[in-house]
Amino acid sequence: MNMKKLATLVSAVALSATVSANAMAKDTIALVVSTLNNPFFVSLKDGAQKEADKLGYNLVVLDSQNNPAKELANVQDLTVRGTKILLINPTDSDAVGNAVKMANQANIPVITLDRQATKGEVVSHIASDNVLGGKIAGDYIAKKAGEGAKVIELQGIAGTSAARERGEGFQQAVAAHKFNVLASQPADFDRIKGLNVMQNLLTAHPDVQAVFAQNDEMALGALRALQTAGKSDVMVVGFDGTPDGEKAVNDGKLAATIAQLPDQIGAKGVETADKVLKGEKVQAKYPVDLKLVVKQ
C-alpha cells in the first residue's frame, strides 16, 4: 500500500469515526491477536484480560485469523471506533507495517506483543528473547544427542520475527555443536502441518536423531508422525511451554520445551498501555523470562 492510498484510507477512517455508534470509551484498550486458534495466543489474551480487569480497563480483542488482510481490517475497525491505544500481536512482522502506519496516522500509540513490526512507529515491544530460546533448545539437543547430531528443524511462519529469531538462535547452536542439519522446513506454527511435514521428511531422512520445532504445536505434530513411524528414539524439542507441550514433556513424550510466559506478555502489554495512556515514559523493549522445561 503506497502512502497516498494509506493517507486516503486513514482520512476516510477518521471521518467515519465521527459518526460511529461504537466509539470506544476512554477506559478501553484494544488487542489484535494473530490467531486465537493457538493455545499460546489464547494464554496471551487471557493474561491481558486479567491485567485489564485488575487496572479497570475494558479489553476489546479481535482475532486476525493468521491473515494480514484481516489484521489490517481489524485495525481499521478499531480506528473507526476511536481506540485510544493499540496492542497488536502481528501475523507477519513485515505485513503488519500498513496496520501500524494506519494507527500512526490516526495518532494511536502502538505496542507490539511477541512479534515485532519492521515498519511504522511502535512505542514499545514486549517479547521473550527468542534468539536465546533457540540457542537453549539447540544446546539441550547437543547435551542429549551429542555433538554432530543429525537434526531436522521445523520452522514457523516465514516473515514473523519469532520464526526468524528462534531460527537464528538455533543456528548458533548448530554452528557450536556441528550439527548435521538434514532439513529445515516451514510448518507454519501449526500442529497438522507439523505432522504432515514431518511425515514427508522422515521418508527422506529416516536417520534423524533430533527435531527442533519452533513451537509446541509443530512439535506435537512431529511427535505424532514419529510415533506412527515407530521412531520412539528421536528426541523432539518444542518452544512456548503451552499446557499441551508441558504435559507431553511430563509424560515423557517431548524431550523438552522452551517455556515462554505468554500470559505475562499479555499482562505486560496492558500494564505498558496503562502507562502510555497516563503519559508516563515506557521502555522501547520489555523482555519477558523464559525457561527450559524437562521432565522432572
Swiss-Prot record:
Single biological process term from Gene Ontology: transmembrane transport
Listed GO CC annotations: ATP-binding cassette (ABC) transporter complex, substrate-binding subunit-containing; membrane; outer membrane-bounded periplasmic space
Chief location bin: periplasm
Keyword Repressor: no
Gene3D superfamilies the UniProt entry points to: 3.40.50.2300
Keywords, comma-separated and alphabetical: Chemotaxis, Periplasm, Signal, Sugar transport, Transport
Disulfide bonds: none
GO molecular function: monosaccharide binding
Subcellular location: Periplasm
Pfam families documented for this protein: Peripla_BP_4
PANTHER family according to UniProt: D-ALLOSE-BINDING PERIPLASMIC PROTEIN-RELATED
Biological role stated in the UniProt entry: Part of the ABC transporter complex RbsABC involved in ribose import. Binds ribose. Also serves as the primary chemoreceptor for chemotaxis.
Subunit structure: The complex is composed of an ATP-binding protein (RbsA), two transmembrane proteins (RbsC) and a solute-binding protein (RbsB).
Name under which the protein is recorded: Ribose import binding protein RbsB
Native organism taxonomy: Bacteria, Pseudomonadati, Pseudomonadota, Gammaproteobacteria, Enterobacterales
Name of the gene this protein is made from: rbsB
